[in-house]
């Protein structure tokens, strides 16, 4: 599974071309995952996630910002 991790506010985690930052963010939530900064979205994107990982779903997004 893969997807955009959410911050405490329910929004995607922003980044500016910093793959290491996103890798740390993804691994803080899911230890065996990987992550990178998705350039076009300027948001962290996680890969190698467990099936039950909660990632952003545009149909149920409750982002405060």
Curated annotation (Swiss-Prot):
The keyword Nucleus does not apply. Its main location: secreted. Keywords: Disulfide bond, Ion channel impairing toxin, Neurotoxin, Secreted, Toxin, Voltage-gated sodium channel impairing toxin. Expressed by the venom gland. The keyword Flavoprotein does not apply. It holds the Pfam family Toxin_3. It is found in: Secreted. Residues 1-64 form the LCN-type CS-alpha/beta domain. Beta toxins bind voltage-independently at site-4 of sodium channels (Nav) and shift the voltage of activation toward more negative potentials thereby affecting sodium channel activation and promoting spontaneous and repetitive firing. This is Putative beta-neurotoxin RjAa43. It comes from Rhopalurus junceus (Caribbean blue scorpion).
